[in-house]
Amino acid sequence: MLKSYPFIGLMGYAAGENPLSYPEVKYAMVLQLINAAAKLVDFVILDCSSNMANVFTPAAIEAGDLVIRILMPDLKGVNYLKAHQPLLVDGRFHYNEHLSLAGMARPFHALDEMGYIIGGWDGLLPYGKEIDRCATEGGMFQAIKYCNSRYTASLSKVLKALEQPEENEGSEEEEESADE
């Protein structure tokens, strides 16, 4: 739990830990962990590596109601995605439903060209020195004060996408009640 935000819980490696600090984790165990967490809280946010060989990444993508992919909008970021795309075509990963955001975007990035290669951007998270400083200082919850309008528009799109599954659940429940 975070002292300043007691409604937010975090889980991850402690200082000095790494994947080798623990016994090997199986895919099914990760899915169980995600499902257990989902029963405890309204939202489970999993910040995963983009490495599909890491057992948490494919499990999180499979279990996620909303998958947000943040790419550097340069050849390295786009080529990395294209190299992993064949691993994500399995229907359980719902690849075409992911939101793709251009992260750390700077004016010199060829956003249109990179977006064309991946099928378009759903949002833009421009680089900001102030945001970078908040991350370095461990104050990411303060960073929202420094986000420009393009950044906040992308965040709003994510929030709207998060609300959609709840709206769909409500309409499904109404349909079931009407059928009875």
Annotate the PLM regions.
Residues 12-13, 45-47, 68-73, 99-104:
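Conserved beta-strand segments of the P-loop GTPase G domain that flank and frequently precede/overlap
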Residues 40-51:
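Glycine-rich phosphate-binding loop used to anchor ATP phosphates in small-molecule kinases
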Residues 103-145, 155:
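Beta-strand-loop-alpha "switch" segments that mediate conformational coupling across diverse proteins
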Residues 137-180:
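NTP-binding/hydrolysis catalytic cores, primarily Walker-type P-loop NTPases
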Residues 1-39, 134-137:
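P-loop/Walker-type NTP enzyme "switch/lid" segment
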Residues 24-31, 82-109, 143-145:
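P-loop/Walker A phosphate-binding loop and immediately adjacent motor/lid segment at beta-alpha junctions
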Residues 55-74:
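Inter-motif core of Ras-like GTPase G domains
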Residues 43, 66, 120-123:
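Well-ordered beta-strand positions
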